[in-house]
Structures are given as C-alpha cells and as structure tokens.
Amino acid sequence: MKIFIDTANVEEIRKASELGVLSGVTTNPSLIAKEGRDLKEVVEEICSIVDGPISAEVISLEYEKMIEEGRELSKLHKNIVIKIPMCEEGLKAVSVLSKEGIKTNVTLIFSSMQALLAARAGATYVSPFLGRLDDIGNRGIEVVEQIADMFKIHEIKTEIIAASVRTPMHVLEAAMAGSHIATIPYKVIIQMSKHALTDIGIEKFMKDYEKAFGENK
C-alpha cells in the first residue's frame, strides 16, 4: 500500500518527504484555508517537493465550473489530480475530465455504491472516509473492504485512497482491507514510526556502548 500525506502544510510535506516514504499528497479547501495561502501557489510548491500524484480540489458545486476549475488546475503540473466531491454534478464533471485524460479523485465517499458510480464515471481514485464513518457508529474499514472486493471482482482499475485516517490502526486496517493507498496526516505518520520498545532498545544500546567504550571513543 502506498502512503500519501494529507496536508497543505509545506513544511510537513517536506519533512515527510525526507523520510522517503511518500508517494503523493492530498489537499482540500479546509487544509488550504488553514495555511492562509493561495491555492495555486501552495499546489505548485507541493509539486516541487513530491514527485507523485497531488490532489487539488475544486471549489464549485456546479459541474460546468468544476470542469473549468479542473482544467485550470491540471495545467499547473503533470502530477495534478483533480479532487471532486461525490455528488451528481461531480460525477458529470469526472466523466468529462476523464475523457480529456485529466486524472480525478472522487472524495467524500461513504458507501461502496458511491465508489462504484465514481469508478464507472471514470475516476482515477476514490476516497472513502474512515474516521467520519466511525464517528457515526459505522465501521469505516468495512466500506473499504467492500470497495476493494468489488473492484477486484469486476476488474475495476480505479484505485482506493483510504482517507480521514486518524490513527496508525486505521492505516493497518486499510492496508489489510486491500486499499491501494492511505492518505495520512503528518502526526500519524510520525506515530507510525514510534514504539516504546524501540525507544527502550535504543537507550539500552547506547548505555551498553558507553559502558564498554566510553562516550568519546
């Protein structure tokens, strides 16, 4: 499973990229607004850091304007993926953009049926939301499992991006459920790298070395 980072914070992206684990980036209007910067400016800078799919979301909810925004965003860089919300207008926009060779990521997926419609409309990626489904008492990972099984049975090429990831356990569950990608906040990526026994082991190694050879040898 590939790892994307879910943020518009360039410094977080830079730090995560240095780890050598990133394959792409996802952003959304909320994340862009949090940074207080121009969308195109942020996206262009992200593209200079990560050589992989970069999802940038349209703002309009009317399909003609979605198409217009998508075309303009796609001109920024060859790696741009147009992120479009799951709705009737969004499906129409995905259908047009996909026929033009523009990659799309249908977001705010909360059911396997939504994922099927998005895939058939031509979406490159679908993004089911784990955490938000968990919030309402559903098991988000079950939706990912259903989508993965359905796509495999019907040989659908659309890739699954597990989104709304809040914990390392979400990442593990997504990987085991067959998701192609998980898009993960920076803090969760760092949490994934930590384990109490690792810290204890490193501390013991250092103490043993210093005891045997001294600090300056």
UniProtKB/Swiss-Prot annotation:
Its main location: cytoplasm. GO terms for molecular function: aldehyde-lyase activity; transaldolase activity. Coiled coil: none annotated. This is Probable transaldolase. The active site is at K83. It catalyses: D-sedoheptulose 7-phosphate + D-glyceraldehyde 3-phosphate = D-erythrose 4-phosphate + beta-D-fructose 6-phosphate. PROSITE patterns: TRANSALDOLASE_1, TRANSALDOLASE_2. Pathway: Carbohydrate degradation; pentose phosphate pathway; D-glyceraldehyde 3-phosphate and beta-D-fructose 6-phosphate from D-ribose 5-phosphate and D-xylulose 5-phosphate (non-oxidative stage): step 2/3. The keyword Transferase applies. Pfam families: TAL_FSA (PF00923). InterPro entries: Aldolase_TIM, TAL/FSA, Transaldolase_3B, Transaldolase_3B/F6P_aldolase, Transaldolase_AS, TSA/FSA_arc/bac. The keyword Metal-binding does not apply. Signal peptide: none annotated. PANTHER family: TRANSALDOLASE (PTHR10683:SF36). Transaldolase is important for the balance of metabolites in the pentose-phosphate pathway. Keywords: Cytoplasm, Pentose shunt, Schiff base, Transferase. The gene is tal. GO terms for biological process: carbohydrate metabolic process; pentose-phosphate shunt. Its EC number is 2.2.1.2. One of its GO terms (cellular component) is cytoplasm. Belongs to the transaldolase family. Type 3B subfamily. It is found in: Cytoplasm.
